[in-house]
Structures are given as C-alpha cells and as structure tokens.
C-alpha cells in the first residue's frame, strides 16, 4: 500500500470518528480546526508501515488506531501551545487553538482529543 493510500485511510478514520460524535458545535469546530491544520501524520503512517512490514493486512481497525495516535498527538500540541505552557501564537502557519477559540475552549478541545 502506498503512502498516500495509508494517509487517506487515517483521514477517513478521523472524519468518521468526528462525524459520529455528539459534541457542542463550538467544541467540534475547535477540535476540527486543529485536526485539519495539516501536519505530516508521521505517527499514524509509521504504525501502518510497521504493520505492513510485519505482513499484517491493513484493516479499518488499524486505521482507527492510527487515527487515535494522531488525535493524541494533536491534543498534546493544543495543550502545549496554551499560555501556561509555551504560549505560542501560531502552529503550522495558523493561529493556535487558544488564540482562535480562547483558552478554555482550547483546553476542552485538547481534552476531547485524548
């Protein structure tokens, strides 16, 4: 399976997960803002690469686990950018979550990704 195919599986798993969740619209917007902010998706990609190297046939459940890795990573980035930590203004060329949605919402968004 090619890299782009693996990444597409992860993106699909992320979209499906957040499409099924019952969040307040403001929380959903904050979470998706950071999930869609870009990034290389290296952690989920590496998981799928390891599975493939072990000759495991990639299934939707594997993509869900890979997506969970990306969610945890994104949540940690949101929390890392908070004023009490690094107080960053920008991440991946965009306003950080707390600069766009406020500190309280960023904390909730980061927590929701865990």
Describe the role of every protein-language-model region.
Residues 1-18:
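N-terminal amphipathic/basic leader segments beginning at the initiator methionine
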Residues 15-114:
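Mg2+-dependent prenyl diphosphate-binding active-site environment of isoprenoid biosynthetic enzymes
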């Amino acid at each position: 399976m090619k890299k782009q195919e693996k990444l597409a599986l992860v993106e699909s798993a992320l979209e499906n997960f957040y499409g099924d969740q019952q969040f307040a619209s403001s929380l959903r917007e904050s979470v998706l803002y950071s999930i869609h902010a870009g990034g290389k998706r290296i952690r989920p990609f590496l998981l799928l690469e390891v599975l493939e190297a072990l000759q495991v046939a990639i299934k939707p459940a594997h993509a869900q686990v890979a997506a969970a890795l990306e969610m945890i990573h994104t949540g940690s980035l949101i929390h890392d950018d908070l004023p009490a930590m690094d107080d960053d203004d920008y991440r991946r060329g965009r306003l950080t979550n707390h600069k766009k949605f406020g500190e309280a919402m960023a904390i909730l968004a980061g927590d929701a990704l865990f």
